[in-house]
Amino acid sequence: RTFKNNDGSALLGNQQMAWLKSALLNSSSTYKIIVLGNQLINAIDGHESYYDCPEERQEIMRFINDNEIPGVLFFSGDRHHSEINVEHHLNYYPIHDITCSALSSPRPKFRGWGKERKLSTRVDNSFITKHNYCVVTVNSDCLVFKFKNKSGRLLFNYSVPQKELGY
C-alpha cells in the first residue's frame, strides 16, 4: 500500500475518460447510467470516493454540463450500505448517485455516524445498513428505485422524474 495522493489522481484515466465522453456525446438514450465502483457525490473523506480524485471528478461534471447532456445518473457501490445522494447545481440539473452494496456484505455493526451524519446530499431515509438490493424500473417518464431486504420486502422507494434530468 502507498500513501494516497490527491494530486492528479484518477479512477478512470485518459483512455476510459475518452471512451466515457464519446459514449455520452453519442448516446440518444433517455437515461445514461454511469456505473462506478466508488461514490461520485459523497464528499466525506476517509473512504473511497470520487472526491479523492477532484480533478477527474470535476472533469466529468464539467463535461456533462458544458455539453448539456441530459439524463445522466450514477450508480455506485463499495460502501457496505445503500443510500441515495443528490447534488444540486445552479446551472444544470441535480446529479443523482444511487449506492447499493449491501446484499452480500452488509455493514457489520454500524458504530455511529461520525461525519456522515451531516451529509447534506443524502436523501432522507435512504441510508440502509441491512442486507438489501435495489430493483430499478425504467419508465419513459421516470426511473423508480426500490430497495428491498433479502426476503424481498420493500425498505425504501425513490423516483426520479425524467423531466428533472435535463436542461
Annotated model-derived regions:
Residues 1-167:
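Metal-dependent phosphoester/phosphodiester hydrolase catalytic core
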